Amino acid sequence: MPGIVGFGVASKLAKENFHGNVSKLMTLKKRLYQGIVSEIKDVHLNGPNVEEGAPHILNISFAGVRGEVLLHALEEKGIYVSTGSACSSKKKGQSHVLKAIGLKEDLIESAIRFSIGIFNTEEEIDYTISVLKEKVNFLRKYKRR
């Protein structure tokens, strides 16, 4: 019985805070996107305009950098991201979703998915941008030809 009551309270709070949470997520997502495109060259937004997609997910390809390699470089700095699309996160191989939206193979292989939560902060977003700039520039020096 306590679990049901707790779920009811959690549901009520989620409903009451829904619009505020969506607004916060969208603000953080825009900050992340704007920071990435202003600090790093040759990036590609995978999906709709940043304001039209889900407020908590940003999928970007970094030309000349394999997504899996960048994922591990970011992990070393305490930043956890995913490769591919949210719809294919448990499947091996290239994302069928990124293929379906018409991305070329090189963009699919360089895709990183950022998932933002309501407890993330602007400082964490800024840290992520700073680390991304450092790691992407470093990895591009060693890209396969």
Question: Which residues fall in each region the model found?
Answer:
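Pyridoxal 5′-phosphate
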Residues: 1-145
